[in-house]
Amino acid sequence: MKHNLIYGIILAIATLTATELSAQSSEGCDLHRTRLIPYPTANEAVEHSLAKQRYMQPITEWVTDSEGLLTGEFTYPFSWVERQIFVRVEGVGVPYEVLVNGKVAGSSTNGHAAAEYNITKISREDKNSLAIRLLDSGSVAPIENFEKGDAHPVAYVLSQPRVRVRDIFYRATIGKSGIVNVDLGAIMHNQTLGTKISRLYYEVYLNDTIRLGAGHRDVSLGMHGVDTMRFGVPVPDSVLWSSESPTRLSLRLKNRIAGRDVEFYNVPLALRELSYENGTFYINGKATTMDWAEVSPNATADIVKSLYERGHRAIRFTAGYVADETLSACDELGIYVAVTAPINSSKMGTSRKRGGNPSNNPRWRAEYVERVEQMIYTTQRHPSVVAYYLADDSANGICLYEAYLAAKRISGNRPVFYEDGNGEWNSDK
């Protein structure tokens, strides 16, 4: 009933002459990343729960009003003093604003991907209100002609130290004699006015019991400095991930600043070497045929499991929002995935002239590019994701050209496709 009420409000909001966002990307967002939850202890990190804990408070229950304002509450404890506070928003489904204690933290024109906002300066000790204002979707309607499910907005309020792990990445390269070289990296961010040194401890585990590698690295960061801490771990090729053997590892991190342990992580890893050459995918050096089954982005983890049981091993999610839990299910099962940015302008025709399809209108360029980049950054740690699609049925033009170039800069070894572009250059097929 609660979700139906929220969805009803969203549909009503779309017909109102309400506050309208210009379709020119978002404001106030922190850099996009795949979901990353800090924990206060190593044991809690290993449990990897999304339940409330000292450094994270989920908001899943909302008080709604008829004007499209969803309001929740979080507590700012004393232990968060001298730390940064972020809110990660997922699954809204329409353009929205984020407000903390009545002050705007930021906004997004793309309600179909996760976004984070730094709310440190507008939060206060003790009780705080957090609101999501649903905005008129008319501004983005020309590029959102795709299936939308019920809205399930979730907000995670996160506390991180002022010298923090901003993101994590990894890459596997098959070497000689059955050894795989794993390149791990943590992007560190100093959000203080002085130079700080972080010591980052790392461990790589198989089945949470067999330690494959461990060590630590130090990095000195100047005022507001950002640097990447890299470390390598050799592992046997028997732990490589594939559809036939979806082996998963875990990366455990501990961030120590001035002798104090300030955040812990337990990040799922799945190692596979990916390449795409002359129309063929190679997984761990083996040519792999992708017999894509087109699936709604609203598919749940249970639907994915059902597809797996029916023999599907490659899924192409059409344009829209794919929940992190759904992609995690694909990781666990060994399903290859292609995700599509939330862009479909099929109702706007194919003309490239003024007033035609938005894909050739420079006014939409920033929106297209951000949606594609956001898709990549928020899914890139999922090993199941082996390809990206720019859009569905959206003609072609300058916006998709620029989106393709942006995607190629950050997609790594994953190919970028666009099948509806009449064979133009902005597709790896």
Set out the residue ranges of the language-model regions.
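Bacterial Sec-dependent N-terminal signal peptides
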Residues: 1-25
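Beta-strand-rich binding/interaction modules
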Residues: 98-100, 179-220, 227-231, 251
